[in-house]
C-alpha cells in the first residue's frame, strides 16, 4: 500500500492539491477527472487509494465529497520512504 503514491497521476493530484484554490476548498472527483483528462471512475480510484493511505482526507459539501491533502501524513510517508521502507 505504501507504493500507492508513486503513481504519476496520484503524485500530480497531490501536487495540484497544494495550489491555493484546491488547498483551501478541496476538490471533487469530477474536478480531478476534468483537470487530468481521465474518466471519473479512474479519478475516484486514485482518490480512494490516496485516502486509504491517509494522504487525503474528505469532507462533505452540498452532498459532494471533497478531497483535501493531509500534509502531516504525507510528510510521515515521505520519511518512511527516505528510511527505505
Regions found by a protein language model. Give the residues of each.
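N-terminal helix-turn-helix DNA-binding core of bacterial DNA-binding proteins
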Residues: 3-39, 61-73
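Short, hydrophobic-biased segments on the C-terminal half of alpha helices
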Residues: 47-48
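Short, structured secondary-structure boundary patches
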Residues: 1, 63-65, 79-83
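Alpha-helical residues within the helix-turn-helix
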Residues: 34, 51-52
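Conserved segment of winged-helix/HTH DNA-binding domains
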Residues: 69-85
Amino acid at each position: 500500500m505504501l507504493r500507492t503514491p508513486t503513481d504519476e497521476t496520484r503524485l500530480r493530484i497531490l501536487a495540484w492539491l497544494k495550489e491555493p484554490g484546491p488547498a483551501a476548498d478541496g476538490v471533487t472527483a469530477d474536478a480531478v477527472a476534468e483537470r487530468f483528462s481521465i474518466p471519473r471512475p479512474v479519478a475516484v480510484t486514485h482518490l480512494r487509494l490516496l485516502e486509504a493511505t491517509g494522504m487525503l482526507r474528505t469532507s462533505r459539501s452540498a452532498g459532494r465529497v471533497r478531497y483535501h491533502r493531509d500534509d502531516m501524513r504525507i510528510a510521515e510517508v515521505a520519511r518512511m520512504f527516505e528510511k527505505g521502507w
